[in-house]
Amino acid sequence: MSGQILWGIMPYIVLTIFIGGHIYRYQHDQFGWTAKSSELLEKKKLAAGSTLFHWGLLCVVGGHVMGILIPEGVYASLGISEHMYHKMAIGAGLPAGIAACTGLVILTYRRLFDKRIRKTSSPSDILTLLLLLFMMLSGVAATFLNIDSKGFDYRTTVGPWFREIVLFRPDASLMESVPLWFKFHIVIGYVVFILWPFTRLVHVFSLPLKYLTRSYVVYRKRS
């Protein structure tokens, strides 16, 4: 019963809060829909941490798409065996995860121990960074624990489970054989997505498209 709730019902609760929360936030707090940049207060650690985190995260998300959304049969039809895929996933995913974690450590340290940054930080800012760091660390840990050549193939369990959720055909039984550390990583992901609409993470959906067509801003020095 608990498995059915966690893997069959909870994903839809998370999705409802995620979508509904963004709609509510947009209608009631458009001025707060921002990343609240603190670049003016400190630049060096922000540049290093943000670069490592965002590029690492981009690669991690790409790896998740390749491993979860694309069925195993597609790789088999291309002549890519489970062992080949596993080596590629470890070789590319582990460095990307470590880079993202390193960036988050830098950003979290900056947020907690830089006096000026700390004074301008809200509790949700700190909680967001800590949760993201926790989620990334759990993902890297799961990768390390699965580094053996005979490691767990999540494409036959987590992948189909996620795709069935998307198709509104939840099958909690697919998660029964999934190792605990993978389940732990997913549950932390639940928490992140539930809190997402109520934190500065909403800035992910704030694409500055108007910048592409607006006139140049001209700066002039005083004579």
Swiss-Prot record:
The gamma chain is a membrane-embedded heme-iron unit resembling cytochrome b, which transfers electrons from quinones to the beta subunit. GO terms for cellular component: nitrate reductase complex; plasma membrane. Keywords: Cell membrane, Electron transport, Heme, Iron, Membrane, Metal-binding, Nitrate assimilation, Oxidoreductase, Transmembrane, Transmembrane helix, Transport. GO terms for molecular function: electron transfer activity; heme binding; metal ion binding; nitrate reductase (quinone) activity; nitrate reductase activity. This is Nitrate reductase gamma chain. It comes from Bacillus subtilis (strain 168). Its EC number is 1.7.5.1. Heme b 1 binds at residues 54, 203. Its cofactor is heme. It is a multi-pass membrane protein. The gene is narI. The keyword Electron transport applies. It is found in: Cell membrane. GO terms for biological process: anaerobic electron transport chain; nitrate assimilation. InterPro entries: Heme-iron_electron_transfer (IPR051936), NarG-like_domain (IPR023234), NarG-like_sf (IPR036197), Nitrate_red_gam (IPR003816).
